[in-house]
């Protein structure tokens, strides 16, 4: 699975865990809702680390926590590029 899809799925998982929908997470993180929707729906070809960091702040987690999953650890480095 490519990294963009993994990021999208991870955000959706964390939203469900923390009780957020797209708009509420965007508001909490200070990110435009369209930016978050573009990441989730696969329209963003390169979700930036700064945006992911803002989302983590809105969720109250660290970047480490965001990426500390089996799926990210087993991602083929070729898929990241």
Model-found features: residue ranges?
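A short, Lys/Arg-rich alpha-helix, primarily the initiator
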Residues: 1-21
């Amino acid at each position: 699975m490519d990294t963009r899809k993994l990021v999208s799925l991870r955000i959706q998982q964390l939203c469900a865990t923390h009780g957020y929908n797209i708009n509420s997470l965007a508001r909490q993180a200070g990110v435009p809702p369209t930016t978050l929707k573009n990441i989730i729906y696969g329209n963003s070809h390169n979700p930036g680390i700064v945006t992911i960091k803002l989302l983590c702040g809105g969720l109250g987690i660290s970047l480490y926590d965001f990426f500390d999953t089996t799926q990210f650890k087993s991602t083929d480095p070729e898929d990241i590029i």
